[in-house]
Regions:
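N-terminal export/assembly leader peptides and their processing motifs that target proteins to secretory
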Residues: 1-110
Length: 110
């Protein structure tokens, strides 16, 4: 299982339970108020269009190859991405591993 939080332009996803997830086959889809972001984050990345550089944890290329329970990943959506994260917006994140959806998460942006 995974937990999702969002504050300002910062999105944090935490691995809360279950098997470790190999990052080599992980894909993330992010949406705001029902609309997918124009630019989706590759995993892992250091710099990517539509995102501030230097994500932490599971999304940073310097991390382990597996995302284990208790570990988090944080990224920041840049103002050049569309739609932007606004307070109160409904943020959705879907995690896919090897083409199979492993999590569908939702929260309000704080």
């Amino acid at each position: 299982t995974f937990d999702l939080s969002a504050e300002g332009d910062r999105i944090t996803i935490s691995h809360a339970g279950g098997d470790p997830v190999g990052l080599d086959a992980l894909r993330i889809e992010i949406g705001v108020d029902g609309e997918k972001l124009a630019h989706q984050p590759p995993v892992p990345f250091f710099a990517a269009e539509g995102f501030h550089g230097g994500p932490s944890g599971a999304f940073n290329p310097e991390t382990d190859d597996e995302w284990a329970v208790g570990e988090s990943g944080t990224l920041r959506v840049a103002g050049t991405n569309d739609p932007t994260l606004e307070p109160g917006a409904r943020l959705t994140v879907e995690l896919f591993h090897g083409g199979k959806r492993i999590a569908s998460l939702s929260t309000r942006v704080g």
